Amino acid sequence: MNISFVLAVYNKLELTKECYKHLRKIYPKSPLVISSGGSSDGTKEWLESLKDENLSFFHDDTRLTFSETYNAGIDLVDTEKLVLIHNDMVIGKHFLENLDRLLDENPNTLLSYTTIEPPIFAGHQRPGKVILDMGTGFDNFNQKMFNKYVKENKNKCELYDGAVFFMSGRKDMFIDLGGFDGFSFVPCFCEDDDFLIRAKLKGYKLKTTECAITYHFVSQTSRFSDEMKDKRQNIEIFSNRNFVRKWGIMISTFNQMGYQIQDEFTFKKFLIGITINDDSNLTLLEPFFDKINLGTIPQGYIDAEQSTTRYDLKSKFEDVNDVDVMIRLNTPLNQEDFNVLTTLRVTIPGYAVGQYEVGNLLIDIRKDI
């Protein structure tokens, strides 16, 4: 085999120890990279104490983003292929063998694996997710039930459309895509959707297999820690707003477009501005536009919002005519107009240069899109 495990951690040392112990029972000599971005709970010292010649590790005393921590781990991989895991997982038999083979058989593919989960988020559907209660932690994990499931499904290696963060691929693919985006998403959330979209736009196939299997305890990692519990909701909101600042549309819009299952998916980012009479809806509108003509620079809004993003908000209100498309809203914003505004980047490429009225919006397409 020519594939490595990559595990990124931030504190949660006892969880990491259990994950490592279970992984080494199945794969005692497989290459493993553990990347620690700012852990302060003894993780660094524990990593240094391990006598494991097949382990490489990275540690930074500074708190890194989720993306930066995984990117640092990926950099250390010296095999052709790699698979990303979490420390709240149990790896099943045949996991690496099946991924290694399937990646060889399916070039230019980002391949996700199956995660069995307890019914904590049963209503949330995604590729590769199987709801079966085999325990909520390492302390009550039903190993026999898990092994039985793995044995029954180890040969079901057909690929189906769709992928998620629980992914594998050739290291060259991760390099080609520039890794995960640690600039936009601080400290976490949305980096997986962003990566998958960029992979699809680069021509990689997004697939999932049933025959590489893990058990995922869910909500055990640092993103669900006591440290994060009071900040998690705001961080998720900020990351989603930064996703829109980057792409101009929401994750849900990409999903509605069915980007993962299209043979040839395209999405063109262009500069779009809006002219508005007042700042009453600025919080709603700002992430969707590259330039905003308000007639002034709203310093109060910038001061309140800038700490939630690394994007330069003041620049949005400068050189406001430097756009490919300008939208004018002369009436109070209603829900119908807002719905149009949030999906304009999808619909505009079908129109020629010119001016169009849609509801209360005047759309001035100044350049060929």
How would you name each of these model-derived features?
Residues S35-E45, N281, P298-Y301:
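A conserved acidic beta->alpha catalytic loop
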Residues D60-V77:
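Glycine-rich, basic loop-to-helix element that forms the pyrophosphate-binding segment
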Residues L82:
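Short aromatic/hydrophobic "clamp" motif used to bind/position activated sugar donors
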Residues G137, N147-D172:
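A recurrent flexible, glycine/aromatic-enriched loop bordering the glycosyltransferase active site
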Residues Y160-G178, S184-I213:
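A short, conserved alpha-helix in the catalytic core of glycosyltransferases
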Residues K21-S30, P287-K291:
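Short, acidic, metal-binding catalytic loop of nucleotide-sugar glycosyltransferases
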Residues M89-M134:
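Conserved donor NDP-sugar-binding/catalytic core segment of glycosyltransferases
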Residues I3-L15, C19, I26-Y27, S35, ...:
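A conserved hydrophobic helix/loop-capping motif in glycosyltransferases and polysaccharide synthases
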